[in-house]
Amino acid sequence: NRFLARNCVFLSIIPKLFPNLSVNLLLRTPQKISYITLTMNDFRFLVITCLIAMLSCTSSLAQLAKRSGSVSKSQSADFQIQASKKIDRLVGADFRRKQIRPLGKANDAEFMRRAYLNAIGRIPSYEEAVSFLNDESPDKRNNLIDSLLGSYGYNMHMFNWWADLLRATDEFEDTSGAPYIKWIKDSIAENKSYKSMVHELISATGGGWQNGAVGYYVRDQGMLKDNMANTTRIFLGTRIECAQCHNHPFDSWKQMDFYQMAAFTNGIKTAKSHLSNYLEDKEDMDGVSRDLIDVSRLIRYAVYDFSIQDTGTGTIRLPKDYKYRDGDPGERVGAKSLSQFGKTVKVSTRSKSTDPGKSRVKFADWLVSPDNPRFTKVIANRMWKRVMATGLFEPLDNFSSASEPSNSALMSYLEELLIDLDYDLLAFQKILYKSYSFQLRPNAIQHPDRSPYHFNGRQLKRLSAEQIWDSLLTLKIKEPDKRLGNGYTGDAIMYRGRPVLVGKKSMRDLYNEVMEIESGDEVWDYTKKLHDQIKSDKGVKSGGGESMQMMMAYNAGKKYG
């Protein structure tokens, strides 16, 4: 039918061209379905059929090419080169305006070391260095960038960056951070867009062993106001924590602004907290063995406490000592995004819990939307600093109303480019790495803090702890990027610091079984049963060494390590 509608003009002239051909057409309209009946006494019908098929295929292929072109722009080598050249033109224009004499181009050895340390977080091995330095191809620098950014080393180095940004750790007090760590690593490995990652983090709900993104809130459990302060610092480049207690003395943020933002995530609760409390009460009873208490705590901390059941009320009460005219002490206010960042989103206060379960989703939608241009500006600047060593505005997380990028035209283009790439951070970095600006010689002149740095080569900086460690490993072992993790437990059940029931039951299994339990007596019976299973596990009896080896092999096979 689509074919008939597309080619109706051509079909209408068939009877005039071929009088021996009888053609009856009912062309498609929005209300009707089209049919075609052909009676042929002339072999020329075969020719017509072929021509019609060619027309239809040509149209379909053109549409397919158009669609695939928009999807693969970030993979287009020509697009990357043109974008890199535009960045260089904008940097060069700033040189002329500021009368800066550009540094020369870094030699191959300087470029190689910089590329390795920046892209995968370590120095090149001897073999890698010899291979690159002896390469005489004109595109060897771009080829090296492609190779490094496509390696496992890039994933691990990028994980270090994300872990630092999100303050991710192996443990959250008494709860394992393994699901959160794995979610971050998996997101990097599949090259999930920055926009998608942030939206998933902010709107995350469920259990950690089903959705590791809930670790973003479990990390700050019981400190939701601090979590919101970190959210605005990380994703909006703005520090509003000062306004938690009073209006900001040097910026436009008010205490009301802080509480309206905090309302988006206020009221988040862990799943089935009544059963968690039941286990805690049981642990305090006389006659309960220490072993059973430890198993009970395993269930409480790793299952119930690592889950988000309620996504927030969307309202919050002002503190009792609130003293400003725009609100009363103890007054309940609705969530509202910061008006300084463009179009706002609000949650009403008409009921105690307005739009239950949707306030965080509304916040996540607004945070990553075009209505909030600050979101794009902040991550574009973070990526520029990651590659070029110094941000277009500094500090990265304190962009105030008085802040101005050192190169406004370049900042605007980087924002435009990131949107054009659909927030593909890998493609964005590749463009920066392939620019001539990245290849300038290092700038050894110390730049004053908190003053605009008009880019003229990467400033020298100390290596991070991770870069030092991975570089030392490069001197000692072969293929350092392929080494297994150092005791990363994946989804193994950890009891007293040792993996148990390896290959028999995982934390995902444990989570699913526990979350089906509805009563306190049932969860206590399950706890005792799990205790017996753990005590009979050979890994525990042998001191854990055998179990640890089994766990590492098991996790490596399942790609957890």
Annotate each predicted stretch with a short phrase.
Residues 37-47:
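Bacterial N-terminal signal peptides that target proteins for export
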Residues 48-56:
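Bacterial N-terminal signal peptides
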Residues 81-113, 123-153, 167-484, 488-498:
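Primarily short, surface-exposed interaction patches in extracytoplasmic proteins
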Residues 65-85:
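Short N-terminal segments immediately surrounding and downstream of signal-peptide cleavage
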